[in-house]
Design a protein with these regions (language model features):
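Active-site metal-binding loops of divalent metal-dependent hydrolases
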Residues: 66-67, 96-98
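Conserved hydrophobic/aromatic beta-strand scaffold that supports enzyme active sites
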Residues: 25-27, 49-53, 64, 142-143, ...
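Surface-exposed cleft-lining segments at the edges of enzyme active sites
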Residues: 37-40, 64-72
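A long, amphipathic alpha-helix that forms part
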Residues: 74-90
Length: 175
């Protein structure tokens, strides 16, 4: 369904806050969000991770992250993400712009030290390139899931809200 509000309207809300100027994370869910928490990374630009619990009907935790552009800061942020993910008891979906300019090897530590899997990346023949939005040639955006999440479909949506195209998954929670 087409979104009714232009991107320029949203950007005007953040122009006076330097760290939010033209940067934002968003989480949209058809299910009620019952818990929300914000984690601010200690390294790099003060970007945050949104942690939200939804019930569909089983509780799952969604994490939305936007990692740093600099490789050194990004590596430290990945270490922080490992701690955040491992502290969660529910099934987890971690998604966001990981800025992995040097390839998937950059998130290897995250995958090895948590229970998360790159279900989309397992389908190597059809990786979802999302950046730049006007001619996608890079995979910087990821959706990682715990083993109790079964991804049935994924797609790149043709909405030009930023320099990246959004990813969408359809999933079930295994019992």
């Amino acid at each position: 369904e087409k979104i009714k509000y232009p991107l320029q309207g949203w950007l005007k809300l953040f122009h006076h806050i330097p760290i939010l100027d033209k940067q934002a994370n968003a989480l949209v869910s058809r299910y009620k969000i019952t818990h929300i928490k914000y984690h601010v990374f200690h390294e790099g630009t003060k970007r945050m991770v949104i942690e939200a619990t939804i019930h569909c009907p089983t509780p799952i935790t969604l994490l939305v992250a936007h990692l740093a552009l600099g490789k050194r800061a990004r590596k430290k942020q990945i270490g922080e993400l490992v701690g955040i993910v491992n502290a969660i008891q529910n099934p987890v979906i971690l998604m966001g712009d990981f800025n992995t300019f040097h390839g998937e090897a950059e998130i290897r530590k995250l995958l090895q030290q948590t229970h998360l899997k790159d279900k989309i990346g397992l389908d190597k023949k059809d990786l979802p390139f999302t950046e730049p939005a006007w001619h996608p040639t890079k995979r910087l955006d990821y959706i990682l899931t715990s083993s109790k999440i079964k991804v049935s479909k994924y797609s790149v949506l043709p909405f030009h809200f930023s320099d990246h195209l959004p990813l969408m998954i359809e999933f079930e929670v295994k019992r």
